[in-house]
Amino acid sequence: MTDYSKTVNLLESPFPMRGNLAKREPAWLKSWYEQKRYQKLREIAKGRPKFILHDGPPYANGDIHIGHAVNKILKDIIIRSKTQAGFDAPYVPGWDCHGLPIEVMVEKLHGKDMPKARFRELCREYAAEQVACQKKDFIRLGVLGDWDKPYLTMDFKTEADTVRMLGEIYKSGYLYRGAKPVQFCLDCGSSLAEAEVEYKDKVSPAIDVGYPFKDTAALAAAFGLAGIEGKAFAVIWTTTPWTLPASQAVSAGADVVYQLIDTPKGKLVLAKDLAEDALKRYGFSDGIAILAETTGDKLENLHMNHPFLERDIPMLNGDHVTTDAGTGLVHTAPAHGLEDYAVCNKYGIELYNPVNAEGKYISETPRVAGMSVWEANPVILQWLEETGNLLASSKIEHSYAHCWRHKTPLIYRATGQWFVGMDKAGADGKTLRDKAIKAVDDTEFFPSWGRARLEAMIEGRPDWVVSRQRYWGTPMTFFVHKETGELHPNSAELLEKVAQRIEEKGIEAWFSLDKGELLSAEDCEHYDKLSDTMDVWFDSGSTHYSVVKQREELDWPADLYLEGSDQHRGWFQSSMLTGCASSMGRAPYKQLLTHGFVVDQNGRKMSKSIGNVVAPQEVYNEFGADILRLWAASTDYSGELAISKEILKRVTESYRRIRNTLSFLFANLSDFNPIEDAVQQADMVEIDRYAVVLARQLQERLAGDYYPRYTFHFAVKDIVSFCSEDLGAFYLDILKDRLYTTKADSRARRSAQTALYHITRSLVLLIAPILCFTGEEAWDIIGGGEEDSVLFHTWHEFPTINEKAEAELVKKWTAIREAREAVTAAIEPLRADKTVGSSLQAEAEITAPEEMAGYLNALGEELRFALLVSKAEVKVGSELAVAAKASDGEKCERCWHYTRDVGAVAGYETVCKRCAENVGREGETRHYA
């Protein structure tokens, strides 16, 4: 008996089904680094149009977390896809290296008792160690970039250019010095920027306090009354009793309606909309009478006594007063609130600040001198009770500003700081706020809702406090007049001279500078060096100038900034403000893309206490970095990204589908040489031409839509669907018979391989931006060998086809696929009851509408191959219907079809006539399937 197994074209795949990624990826990385892949790519891409994604610098402190991994993976997918789209897309990774967290770590490791120069030296060393640690993990994720020459905000050149950016803003006229209330962290001992503030719930005392009116006759007149007997109070409500020693006024809303109410306590002034709730808090249900009503503008300039200090308190009108909660009257302490400051400034009230930088009251403050503001709260409540001016006291849980580093409550505190003014007219007569809002309009957002979010933040943000009272940071290199506080008239020129020194020696050049080196002897008598450093957000917000504008391979403005959604109030905003406030006069980016935060499968934040933290190091060590990359790409990053072991296992299934498809494709291309064996398109079997069209359409969707629009989850879904539906469940299922049973060098088989070659080459290029390791592994086989890279090539060029012919081809095979699905469904009951095993054991009689029947009949004898049955007949009817039955033919032991011609050819007793032709003669021909 003849063994026909050796006559079928079953080839071994050079692409194993098991990726073994976790073990193999590090070796690939080593090889790519040794081959200088990134540097070669820069040479190959030279002269192409540029695409610049500017890296938002992560902070150089601690191991990378899963959020870092998502961010870098998304950036890498974009860089790779843009490269394959024909752009020169260099990627320069960066790190944020100055600031308090590093100071804190150095203090923990080395203590505080050392010269400041040594302290800064240790900060620089610590930051460099952290950069090296994080860099290793980013590279392990497959992120392609200039890792040998990243940018660091502590590079001497970058520090110098950050100083130059300060000079730009100074020359533009937006920089000023002022004593304003700013968010102040008592643990940091410094002011904080907007982006350094986070909000958490806090329990605070909530109190109602009466301010006794001085002149009840004037109060009566304001309410249209002839007179008032007894005491009268303006009642305020506050959750910060500690600010009362700084209270300098009470604010009323000009259009708010107020009532004068007679109560057992005396006459109370309360907002009409809040009076009922307020009186309940005071326990007044009887003996109440509403005496009169008036509006807040009539109360303006009335005077009261402070509730426990000897201080005159005027009544002001403020736009910030609402009737959402409280009493409708607001105690106003300009040292401890921006709105308070603004309204007092309007009335010419000079700011009084009784709280020092340690959060303690100065010695002149009665009863609470030397106490912290938090310690003072109960003392102040006791004081109010003694004076009889405390109407109610309770506890309230509310959202409150906290330091993002220390997680401790912040206070507003007026300090002398340097600001970038939002509403100050610059040298060009325009305000920074107006420029920034215009810049938002000129920016493209992904997702689109980012526009409204950033615009609202810019519209509502205060002036940017850019000075810090720290040691490890880029210095504000100004010379300030000792008496007037004015900057030296030659500040612009002096800044540049200092920047040149910093470029050589780093920021220590400023701290060690003797002012006599740059100033005349006379100027030295009148000017001092400023000791403040800059907000770290100014450092990172200036990198578009210090990095993008300076590095030869980059172009300004950047095409894209991509960060987490919290950066609307962080890096996106600080970069926009420095861009708009400088001579560039615009945002330093054309597009902004934001991604959500990573949560667990239940939507909870990652937390060590919950035990749901998924570390990227654990993922790539267990599953491989390509699985982490596929997870990041397959998740809609516009919302939260859920991750867990179970989710990663599901992602692994998708990866396996792609990998198994590639393994099959490579097996059946292992004896195919595209130069010698390819079949011209016009001579290809029809279904092969159709499959190539499907692959080209997939490429058009990914290369023309999903990758350019950054919708990677659609790309992954489409790739997996193409592998499982178009290929696995349809084309490859049909193709196996032709690949395995026709003659190895026949046109029928070479046509199939030609289609597979186009499909495989395109598919490898399409997956490569996401599955960078798998893509390169596959390209080693189908590309130019180990020294070649998938990144050295642009999207696959498919053979062209007449548009009309293509449309007809797709229409025809779409109908055939529909018929095949109906046939498969009709056979299913026969398989379920074991009447047949495979579909080849069945025959099908198809009734179809005329057009579909025409398409099916056009395939003639080859219809059975397209439908995966041993026999198929077609007749015309009103709708699609299929009758399936078991074949009464005999099974061919070579092709497994059931036919009535097994043994019909002498010498081939166990195989069908077709197989006899393929084994011993010229072989069959195919036209359609």
Curated annotation (Swiss-Prot):
How the cofactor is bound: the record states: Binds 1 zinc ion per subunit.
> The motif 'KMSKS' region: which residues?
605-609
Reaction catalysed by this enzyme? tRNA(Ile) + L-isoleucine + ATP = L-isoleucyl-tRNA(Ile) + AMP + diphosphate
Positions that bind Zn(2+): C892, C895, C912, C915
Q: Carries keyword Methyltransferase? A: no
Using the UniProt record, give the first listed, main subcellular location.
Answer: cytoplasm
List ligand-binding residues for L-isoleucyl-5'-AMP: E563
Q: Which GO terms describe its cellular component?
A: cytosol
Q: Do you know which InterPro entries this protein is assigned to?
A: aa-tRNA-synth_I_CS, aa-tRNA-synth_Ia, Anticodon_Ile_BEm, Ile-tRNA-ligase, Ile-tRNA-ligase_type1, Ile-tRNA_ligase, M/V/L/I-tRNA-synth_anticd-bd, Rossmann-like_a/b/a_fold
What's in the keyword line of the UniProt record? Aminoacyl-tRNA synthetase, ATP-binding, Cytoplasm, Ligase, Metal-binding, Nucleotide-binding, Protein biosynthesis, Zinc
Domain comment, as recorded: IleRS has two distinct active sites: one for aminoacylation and one for editing. The misactivated valine is translocated from the active site to the editing site, which sterically excludes the correctly activated isoleucine. The single editing site contains two valyl binding pockets, one specific for each substrate (Val-AMP or Val-tRNA(Ile)).
Q: What does this protein do?
A: Catalyzes the attachment of isoleucine to tRNA(Ile). As IleRS can inadvertently accommodate and process structurally similar amino acids such as valine, to avoid such errors it has two additional distinct tRNA(Ile)-dependent editing activities. One activity is designated as 'pretransfer' editing and involves the hydrolysis of activated Val-AMP. The other activity is designated 'posttransfer' editing and involves deacylation of mischarged Val-tRNA(Ile).
Give the protein family.
Belongs to the class-I aminoacyl-tRNA synthetase family. IleS type 1 subfamily.
Q: What is this protein called?
A: Isoleucine--tRNA ligase
Organism of origin is Neisseria meningitidis serogroup C / serotype 2a (strain ATCC 700532 / DSM 15464 / FAM18)
Instruction: Quote the gene name from the UniProt entry.
Output: ileS
